[in-house]
A protein has these predicted regions:
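Extreme N-terminal starter segment of soluble prokaryotic enzymes
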Residues: 1-5
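Glycine-rich phosphate/diphosphate-binding loop of Rossmann-like nucleotide-binding domains
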Residues: 6-23, 28-29, 151-221, 233
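Buried hydrophobic positions in well-ordered alpha/beta secondary-structure cores of metabolic enzymes
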Residues: 11-14, 67, 134, 173, ...
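Buried hydrophobic packing segments
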Residues: 21, 25, 203, 295-306, ...
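N-terminal beta-loop-helix "entrance" segment that forms/cooperates
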Residues: 33-57, 225-227
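Glycine-rich phosphate/nucleotide-binding loop
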Residues: 45-48, 227-328
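N-terminal glycine-rich phosphate/adenylate-binding segment common to multiple enzyme folds
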Residues: 49-156, 242-244
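Glycine-rich phosphate/pyrophosphate-binding loop and the adjoining helix
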Residues: 138-139, 143-180, 184-186, 190-192, ...
Length: 356
């Protein structure tokens, strides 16, 4: 297979972790006979420094012409004084909008080798945990109308969803549940919010098309509690932008380290945007100590969802597991008795296991 992948290293540790993810994808291409080309572009602060804007039209066009986009991280204190409309994070929002992605996938798994890093009691994670949180990206209160009174003493943010917005996300959720363990939990606040009542009604109607999927409903406050008390009960969780933002970060804490967590943003085509969920970590940038595994695992989502290469994705996941089995750890997941390695060495280790 030939594939064109745009890389957006971004800021601070972004270039370091992207380099390792590309290294591993190149190992996959070598082993399985694929031809991956990588087109590196600037995003966020790096783009501001070079072009004066966080995302150029040329970069967006390149992303939309690619088979997939792999991103590092954007933002940091260097650009704190930049006017809000040109901040690095605005580049990411514009990229998501320009690529027309609307579904954010956040896997939550606990690697057995890192169970000690999970803050939950051992009995709460005794069963395998494999959750996929599906968050809507383009609607909800983040994109609703905003108002602030002239005296700055009152403010309003509008929460809004339409049936088509919920339907297109739900379709992805149901199809994903069919391929996984056949369970979908829809999270809302339908006892209070009209927006959530529309959400639940839409999920209920669509569930009739998927009789093989077991559907459940939870209010968001209960879902937040159940993620702690019994995370193994969940398979696919589907929710809106605001609730998903909060729950997906909670799930990252369960996994033990932000550095291990990948994500994908998908639309109605196979082209997707893939990135780790952690930030740009300016405090450790340039020291070759960042954890690249979240970015490397984002590459598995890229292979699986954009290129349809399931065996290749599984090969990377197996390689990561082997490296962890052998005791190698970056500083954020290090514990006594393990072998501490840097960002580059971790990438080398995973790539070598892919090729073996």
């Amino acid at each position: 297979m030939k594939a064109n992948i745009v890389t957006l290293p971004g800021d601070y540790i972004g270039p370091e972790i992207i380099t390792q993810a590309v290294k591993v994808l190149q190992a996959v291409a070598e082993k399985y006979g694929h031809e991956f080309s990588f087109d590196e572009r600037k995003l966020g602060g790096a783009s501001i420094d070079a072009f004066g804007v966080p995302l150029t039209d040329e970069t967006l066009a390149a992303c939309n012409a690619a088979d997939a986009v792999l991103m590092g991280s954007v933002g940091g204190p260097k650009w704190d004084a930049v006017e809000p409309a040109r901040r690095p994070e605005k580049g990411l929002l514009a990229l998501r909008k320009g690529m027309q992605v609307f579904a954010n996938l956040r896997p939550c798994t606990i690697h057995p080798q890192l169970a000690g890093a999970c803050p939950l009691r051992p009995d709460l994670i005794s069963k395998p945990i494999d959750i996929m949180i599906l968050r809507e990206l383009t609607g909800d209160i983040y994109f609703g109308k905003r108002w602030r009174s002239e005296d700055r003493a009152a403010a309003t943010d509008e929460m809004a969803y339409s049936v088509p917005e919920v339907e297109r996300l739900a379709r992805i959720g149901f199809e994903m549940a069919k391929k996984r363990r056949g369970k979908l939990c829809s999270v809302d606040k339908a006892n209070v919010l009209e927006c959530s009542r529309l959400w639940r009604e839409t999920i209920e109607r669509m569930s009739r098309e998927y009789p093989e999927v077991e559907v459940s409903y939870m209010y968001v406050d209960n879902a937040a509690m159940q993620l702690i008390l019994n995370p193994a009960q969940f398979d696919v969780m589907i929710t809106g932008n605001l609730f998903g933002d909060i729950l997906s970060d909670e799930s990252a804490a369960i996994a033990g380290s932000l550095g291990m967590m990948p994500s994908a943003s998908l639309g109605s085509t196979t082209r997707g945007l893939y990135e780790p969920i952690h930030g740009s970590a300016p405090d450790i940038a340039g020291r070759d100590i960042a954890n690249p595994l979240g970015t490397i695992l984002s590459g598995t989502l890229l292979l699986r969802h954009s290129l349809g290469l399931e065996a290749e994705a599984a090969a990377i996941e197996k390689a990561v597991s082997q490296v962890l089995d052998e005791g190698y750890r970056t500083g954020d997941i290090f514990s006594e008795g393990c072998i501490k390695v840097g960002c580059t060495q971790m990438g080398d280790l995973v790539a070598k296991r892919v090729l073996s």
